[in-house]
């Protein structure tokens, strides 16, 4: 996981609050290249972010990928230390400031992401996780987002209490597990000049495909993932309902046993015999362990994300459908005349 090597990182003596993330173009290109290469193999791309903190800005100046977990001969910790040591020799920022990973069908929220960012953020206070959406970026929309765990989520994870009472006490929901940090991309003046020159050499877009709906794969993937997440949430709800039924049955039996004991103690008191303490009955009914609700909370967040993506995609497709219908009607009217 991405928390491998977090304990070897160093922290900066600066404010823990990060207002925004500034990422160099070189680091962005390396992340994009790595994520797209791994997406072809259906693997999750992960890597380390290097940089420094200036005031309340986290500057990401470089990055490198983590070795694949399937390579048993690779010492992952030694690999990361060697890379950072060599970067230091060539005067490149080598301080560990977080990690990055690719996202699956536009949805990055997961238990593994939460655990990894918790280990990072407790070891490197200013660390962030940068998530790159390969599918959305492949359609021409660069999707690069930075996240940090909220203080409530960190406190909940430290306590290790994921019961419904803990969620209510800390006021934690799927929408308050992570806080999105604004991210900006910065290039050097020479790079900006080169990009301007390249832009002039590119052919003009004639706009032939602006009405392309492209609903086949995108909507299908989101719907499939949404159905899977809904099934998982249903199973979590079934397990929690069974727990509540068992607790209700146990409480009913305990109250019945206590009432019976109270009647027996009243008879013993009338006869002058010693009464039996209620603790003897209570010991027979051990409290049931409360099932953790963290998985259900994360699944709810994934469902919400998929629903938002589907709603956004459908609204854009409906607009294109209305435009296409108008063009088709205009064409038919022209042919009739």
UniProtKB/Swiss-Prot annotation:
HAMAP family: eIF3h. The gene is eIF-3p40. InterPro entries: eIF3h, eIF3h_C, JAMM/MPN+_dom, JAMM_MPN+_peptidase_M67A, MPN. This is Eukaryotic translation initiation factor 3 subunit H. Component of the eukaryotic translation initiation factor 3 (eIF-3) complex. The eIF-3 complex interacts with pix. Interacts with mxt. The keyword ATP-binding does not apply. It comes from Drosophila virilis (Fruit fly). Residues 21-153 form the MPN domain. One of its GO terms (biological process) is positive regulation of Notch signaling pathway. One of its GO terms (cellular component) is eukaryotic 48S preinitiation complex.
């Amino acid at each position: 996981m991405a928390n491998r090597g977090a304990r070897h990182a160093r922290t900066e003596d600066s404010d823990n609050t990060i207002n925004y993330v500034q990422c160099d173009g070189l680091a962005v290109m390396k992340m994009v290249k790595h994520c797209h290469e791994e997406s072809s193999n259906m693997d999750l791309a992960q890597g380390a972010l290097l940089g420094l903190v200036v005031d309340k800005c986290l500057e990401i100046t470089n990055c490198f990928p983590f070795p694949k977990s399937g390579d048993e001969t690779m010492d992952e910790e030694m690999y990361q230390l060697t890379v950072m040591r060599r970067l230091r020799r060539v005067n490149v920022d080598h301080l560990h400031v977080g990690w990055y990973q690719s996202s699956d069908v536009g949805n990055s929220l997961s238990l593994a992401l939460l655990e990894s960012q918790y280990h990072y953020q407790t070891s490197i206070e200013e660390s962030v996780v940068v998530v790159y959406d390969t599918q959305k970026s492949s359609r021409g929309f660069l999707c690069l987002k930075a996240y940090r765990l909220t203080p409530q989520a960190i406190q909940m994870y430290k306590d290790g209490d994921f019961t419904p009472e803990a969620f209510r006490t800390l006021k934690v929901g799927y929408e308050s597990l992570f806080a999105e940090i604004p991210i900006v991309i910065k290039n050097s003046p020479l790079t900006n000049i080169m990009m301007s020159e390249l832009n002039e050499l590119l052919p003009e877009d004639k706009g032939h495909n602006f009405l392309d709906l492209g609903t086949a794969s995108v909507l299908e993937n989101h719907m499939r993932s949404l159905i899977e997440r809904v099934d998982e949430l249903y199973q979590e709800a079934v397990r929690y309902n069974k727990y509540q039924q068992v607790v209700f049955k146990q409480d009913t039996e305990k109250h019945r046993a206590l009432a019976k004991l109270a009647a027996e103690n009243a008879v013993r008191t009338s006869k002058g015999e010693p009464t039996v303490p209620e603790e003897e009955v209570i010991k027979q009914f051990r409290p049931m362990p409360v099932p953790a609700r963290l998985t259900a909370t994360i699944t709810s967040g994934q469902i919400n994300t998929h629903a938002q993506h589907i709603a956004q995609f459908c609204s854009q497709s409906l607009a294109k459908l209305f435009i296409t219908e108008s063009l088709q009607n205009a064409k038919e009217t022209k042919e009739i005349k």
